[in-house]
Amino acid sequence: MSKSASRARLLEIIRRRSFGRGEVTLASGRKSDFYFNLKPTMMDPEGATLLAELTYEALKDEGFDYIGGLEMGAVPLAGAIAQISWIKGHPIAAFFVRKKPKEHGAKLAIEGLTRDETLAGKRIVVVEDVTTTGGSAMKAVETLREAGANVSLVFTMVDREEGAAETFAAAGLPFRALYKAREFL
């Protein structure tokens, strides 16, 4: 399937499985009359594959060492993208950032790394399923920067176009999206 056909097919899947109308309160606290819940698309075999392939194709030539983001939305994305990257012969390792470090066990804020593995100095792309203001992704960025990571890009599946670009620009971060909310409205 061509890139444009894959993109059109994924848009259909997101529209059917993950887009809805009706008043909701977003993670940002804002009210909206439409919403995206990408989890049904991320858990669908075709949807997960298309999300991973299209994201991998958008990122493969940029030299990222790791891909990940804030739990929960980034977990299935990062895992699927890492798998596709291995299959395509250009592996990008995955991780995720906990909203709050575990209070037991290793008490980690960043999961997916071995004990002797570090993100310090590594080129990182932070991925997110849906971005509104950018606040959730910035939590991951802050944790990663504290760990010494070089966060080089924030990449979202759907940008609601409600301030995220400005948030990331103010933090000196490039921001890209697979889709814009207006494509579904």
Swiss-Prot record:
One Gene Ontology biological process: 'de novo' UMP biosynthetic process
Keyword list, A-Z: Glycosyltransferase, Magnesium, Pyrimidine biosynthesis, Transferase
Known pathway: Pyrimidine metabolism; UMP biosynthesis via de novo pathway; UMP from orotate: step 1/2
Binding site for 5-phospho-alpha-D-ribose 1-diphosphate: R98, K99, K102, H104, E128, D129, V130, T131, T132, T133, G134, G135, S136
Residues given in the record as orotate binding sites: T132, R160
GO molecular function: magnesium ion binding; orotate phosphoribosyltransferase activity
Main EC class the enzyme belongs to: transferase
Claim: Glycosyltransferase is one of the keywords in the record: yes
Cofactor(s) annotated in UniProt: Mg(2+)
InterPro entries according to UniProt: OPRT, Or_phspho_trans_dom, PRibTrfase_dom, PRTase-like
Similarity annotation: Belongs to the purine/pyrimidine phosphoribosyltransferase family. PyrE subfamily.
Record's protein name: Orotate phosphoribosyltransferase
Lineage: Bacteria, Pseudomonadati, Pseudomonadota, Alphaproteobacteria, Hyphomicrobiales
